[in-house]
């Protein structure tokens, strides 16, 4: 809004402003950023009888070709590249193997998180001594037994081989980073008891 009374002090500032001077400016936020992601997701499942039980296999994977956030339309220098970063590697996959015999079953889940860059937007290769983060593979093992009365007991070991997270030396908090990507706890055990009625 603009000043319509040039001879009267403004309520906001207590001073006399010339006619037409800006008193307030109303600025609205606009969501103009855009995320562009391209890649391929694949999954396959197969099960067959083996010996006294049934073996099941499930494979799922993602190949990420492009993951770019456009912060300012028309200005590519502000784009944030995430594909190839350690949090968005080009390749992620998991393989779940199950074997069931009657009321007993075991499962092994293998998770692969591909290698990546600590900073995918680094201006040059010399910006960091080592900008790479190696891949990690985790194995989770579980076993269950279902009783006739509706009770089921499950025992599991996550990160079976106690695989350690990668070291990150490029500004991340602490020497190991991002618990949403890597297992920071190490090998862990869990026991659950379920009842269905």
Regions found by a protein language model. Give the residues of each.
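C-terminal beta-signal and adjacent terminal beta-strands/loops
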Residues: 65, 111-122, 144-197
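Gram-negative outer-membrane beta-barrel transporters
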Residues: 1-121
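Residue-level preference for beta-strand/loop junctions
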Residues: 36-38, 89, 135-137, 149, ...
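Non-catalytic C-terminal accessory modules of carbohydrate-active enzymes
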Residues: 114, 133-135
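Outer-membrane beta-barrel proteins
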Residues: 30-34, 130-133, 180
């Amino acid at each position: 809004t603009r000043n319509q009374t040039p001879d009267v002090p403004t309520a906001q500032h207590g001073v006399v402003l010339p006619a037409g001077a800006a008193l307030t400016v109303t600025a609205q936020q606009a969501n103009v950023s855009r995320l562009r992601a391209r890649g391929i997701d694949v999954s396959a499942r197969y099960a067959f009888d083996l010996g006294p039980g049934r073996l099941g296999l499930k494979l799922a994977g993602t190949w990420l070709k492009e993951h770019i956030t456009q912060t300012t339309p028309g200005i590519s220098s502000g784009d944030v590249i995430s594909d190839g970063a350690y949090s968005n590697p080009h390749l992620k996959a998991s393989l779940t193997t199950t074997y069931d015999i009657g009321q007993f079953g075991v499962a092994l889940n293998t998770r692969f998180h591909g290698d990546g860059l600590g900073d995918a937007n680094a201006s040059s290769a010399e910006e960091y001594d080592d900008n790479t983060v190696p891949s990690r593979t985790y194995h989770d093992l579980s076993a269950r037994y279902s009783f006739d009365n509706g009770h089921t007991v499950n025992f599991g070991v996550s990160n079976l081989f106690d695989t350690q997270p990668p070291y990150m030396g490029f500004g991340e908090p602490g020497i190991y980073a991002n618990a949403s990507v890597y297992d920071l706890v190490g090998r862990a055990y869990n026991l659950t008891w379920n009842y269905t009625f």
